[in-house]
Amino acid sequence: EFFIHYLRKDGPDKWEKSEKVNSTQSFYTLHGLQPGSQYRLKIDFNNTKWEQEIQTAGARVMEVKSGFVTESWFIGLISALVLLLLVLLILCFIKRSKGGKYSVKEKEEGQIDSEARPMNNEAFGEYRSLESDNEEKRTASQPSLCEDSKLCTDDGLDDYANSNSVQTEVIMDESLASQSSGVRDVPDAETQESSPLNPATAISHHGLPNSAALLD
């Protein structure tokens, strides 16, 4: 009995051996070989060594080499990262939805304030414009009023002076007329004794002189 050792040339560098083979067998089928591959066969029997390379028949099957991608720890790590990313996305979505509500509310309040502020500014501007217009009208009307009042005052003073002069002339005319009539109406010496030549005996009627004398 003996064993057949075989090695795949394009495979791992590891010799494998078959089951026990009886030397009386005329042929033996070696199982577990890949089709379309080259193998090295080696037989050791009673100090006899035999070695040969063979090519298996059939189409070669492409094998996927195992690496760290197929390892369980790598798959677990990728799954944990995906789960963590999903949790972060959910938290960001919740925060964004809350922030959107607050931002909309603040935006509405800002619009209300901005709408109210221009109205106040416009009303204040209109109030100031009305005040400025009133002041301009007042300043424009004051000189004219002053001029009119000045003219009225000047006219009033002229009228007052004219009326006073007229009254003075009338009073003077009346006094002169009364004096001249008193001089003409003197009948006797008694009247002459009470004339202005004798002031002690002068008699006045109603505050007006009865006679007038011309003194040289």
From Swiss-Prot:
GO terms for biological process: cell adhesion; cell differentiation; nervous system development; positive regulation of axon extension. Residues 1-64 form the Fibronectin type-III domain. The chain crosses the membrane at residues 74-94. Residues 95-216 are cytoplasmic. One of its GO terms (cellular component) is axonal growth cone. Residues 127-149, 173-216 are annotated as: Disordered. Keywords: Cell adhesion, Cell membrane, Cell projection, Developmental protein, Differentiation, Glycoprotein, Membrane, Neurogenesis, Transmembrane, Transmembrane helix. The keyword Secreted does not apply. It is found in: Cell membrane; Cell projection, Growth cone. Its main location: membrane. Belongs to the immunoglobulin superfamily. L1/neurofascin/NgCAM family. This is Neural cell adhesion molecule L1.2. It comes from Danio rerio (Zebrafish).
